[in-house]
Regions:
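Structured secondary-structure scaffolds
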Residues: 1-158, 176-221, 227-240
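Acidic/polar loop patches that form or flank catalytic/metal-binding clefts of enzymes
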Residues: 3, 72-78, 115, 129-130, ...
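Feature representing long, continuous alpha-helical segments
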Residues: 19, 57, 116-117, 209, ...
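Short, contiguous acidic/charged loop-to-helix segments that flank catalytic cores in large enzymes
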Residues: 38-39, 46-54, 106, 221-227, ...
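Acidic, turn-prone loop/beta-hairpin segments
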Residues: 87, 120, 160-188, 213-293
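C-terminal low-complexity, glycine/proline- and small-hydrophobic-enriched intrinsically disordered tails
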Residues: 137, 255-432
């Protein structure tokens, strides 16, 4: 057997890729495609992004060639190994299976921004991406949230200044700016360490849960803060830009009252930097949120979860500006009158949380239908517990049933016991 002398490694040219596009080894040929200083300016580069499946074929060979031909200087400082994109079941995409998703079709149906954000959010280190319509729909809803926030802000104020151009004075503005500071710090850190999925998750949580679900709802009790919230949202869009460049540019200029042709793209603006936190405002609104959540829970007990009630009492474990807090609690908890007290209120529905207690007076509420409903729930749970105990105490059942079935029944018993304890406590609070 004789080795063929006319064989070139398939990956040989790829191994030179870190240098050859910069003019290395071309001996002056095709000089119109590169500048004389390209090799000096761009070698070594800062980052290579690639799939882990070609690490040996391509990445390792580039490192060896780069080191060999450039006096020991490696071609990249960092290498980011991204996941492989699979179908929604986790199977590798292939034409023979018919499960290939054409990116152009996806862009047409969902938009490039939604696809970018979805892939970033799902790019968990060490795990392949399972991509399907369900994922894309989730992040379509996120873009709807961005549009809805913009529309709400402009229902109240036509245009907004940038955050650096205003002084944030309202309590709500100070609070949301402080929460933005936390998001900025965390997103900068995760981007710098290539944890793009964490960056996307933090951004998603801030926009959806903090700014929209709480900040915008709070602003309905404090219209003066909306101009500040608009500036904070514009700063947020700068963090959205790397993931969703088209939507973020559009909404930023819409809020500014400008067009992209008249101003700069977010892509060339400075990414948000360190913002000073306001812990006093954060602590204040943490208690306000806790009070609202506790009142909502208490209202569910009396079947008035989404209805407005006349009065509620709140007993705090710490001191806050109660007059400032009242409008937010009244608006979001749907309570006409709030009274802060120092002692427990008798004859009331009580909800106890970490830092406060809330009381709903029962004097004007017909409690009998509620007591009847809870009593029936208790009776049903008692029968369920009796049935599960009977099965789990049956030696024959335990010996023959699969372990998964036994574990499922044990969990069901634990859940039923927790529920009956809660129902019994509620009945006791009614002296029933």
């Amino acid at each position: 057997m004789t080795q063929d002398p006319d064989v070139l490694d398939t990956w040989f040219s790829s191994a030179l890729w870190a240098m050859s596009p910069l003019g290395w080894g071309n001996n002056g040929k095709l000089s119109e495609l590169y500048n004389e200083s390209d090799m000096e300016d761009f070698y070594p580069n800062s980052l290579l992004i690639t799939g882990f499946d070609i690490m040996f074929f391509w990445v390792a060979r580039m490192m060896m060639m780069g080191e060999h031909f450039n006096k020991g200087q490696l071609p990249f400082k960092d290498i980011y190994m991204h996941a492989l994109v699979r179908d929604e079941t986790g199977a590798k995409m292939s034409k023979s299976k018919g499960n290939v998703i054409d990116p152009l079709d996806m862009v047409e149906e969902h938009s490039a921004d939604i696809i970018r954000f979805t892939l970033a959010y799902l790019a968990v280190q060490g795990r392949d991406i399972k991509l399907g319509a369900k994922n894309l729909d989730q992040f379509r809803n996120f873009t709807n949230k961005l549009y809805n926030a913009t529309n709400y802000l402009q229902l109240n104020v036509d245009t907004f200044k940038d955050l650096g151009e205003i002084e944030v004075k309202t309590p709500l503005g100070r609070y949301m700016q402080s929460r933005l500071a936390v998001a900025v710090e965390e997103i900068r850190e995760t981007l710098e360490t290539y944890k793009f999925n964490e960056s996307a998750r933090i951004l998603y949580n801030f926009v959806w849960n903090e700014f929209c679900d709480w900040g915008i709802e709070y602003s309905k009790a404090d219209r003066e803060s909306i101009a500040e919230l608009g500036a904070i949202f514009k700063e947020t869009l700068k963090m959205v830009s790397p993931f969703m460049p088209f939507i973020s540019d559009h909404l930023y200029h819409k809020l500014s009252g400008t067009t992209l042709e008249e101003g700069d793209s977010l892509m060339v603006m400075n990414f948000p930097k360190e913002i000073k936190r306001d812990l006093e405002a954060e602590n204040m609104f943490a208690l306000i949120e806790e009070a609202i959540t506790a009142l909502r829970r208490a209202k569910v007990i009396i079947d008035m979860g989404n209805s407005k009630i006349d009065k509620a009492y709140i007993k705090l474990d710490s001191q806050i500006d109660t007059e400032m807090a009242k409008p937010f609690i009244q608006k979001l908890a749907k309570v006409i009158e709030i009274e802060f007290v120092d002692a427990k209120v008798e004859n009331s529905i009580t909800d106890v949380s970490d830092n406060l207690e809330v009381y709903l007076p029962t004097a004007e509420i017909d409690m009998q239908p509620i007591i009847t409903k809870l009593t029936r729930q208790k009776e049903k749970l008692e029968k369920e517990i009796q049935k599960l105990n009977g099965m789990l105490n049956n030696e024959r059942f335990v010996a023959n049933a699969p372990e998964a079935v036994i574990a499922e029944n044990k969990q069901a018993l634990e859940d039923a016991e927790n529920k009956i304890a809660k129902v019994s406590a509620e009945l006791s609070s009614f002296n029933a």
